[in-house]
């Protein structure tokens, strides 16, 4: 199981860093920050599928 620590999130703004992650919703997130913000928004239902684009 691949996991990302989102305990420091949500954050009000994310950098434009390009390190894509693929979520369990089959959506590509540009970086950990945007992914973790989405995880918080989903109340923890969103998980990491894998690193890289979906």
Curated annotation (Swiss-Prot):
Which PANTHER family does the record match to this protein? OVOMUCOID-LIKE-RELATED, SERINE PEPTIDASE INHIBITOR, KAZAL TYPE 2, TANDEM DUPLICATE 1-RELATED
InterPro entries recorded? Bifunctional_prot_inhibitor, Kazal_dom, Kazal_dom_sf
Q: Which CDD domains match?
A: KAZAL_FS
Disulfide bonds, which pairs? 6-36, 14-33, 22-54
Query: Which SUPFAM superfamilies does this entry report, sorted A to Z?
Result: Kazal-type serine protease inhibitors (SSF100895)
UniProt-listed Pfam families: Kazal_1
The site annotation (Reactive bond 3) covers 16-17
Q: Which GO terms describe its cellular component?
A: extracellular region
Kazal-like domain residues are 4-54
| Keyword annotations from UniProtKB, A to Z | Disulfide bond, Glycoprotein, Protease inhibitor, Repeat, Secreted, Serine protease inhibitor
Q: What is this protein called?
A: Ovomucoid
Q: Where in the cell is it found?
A: Secreted
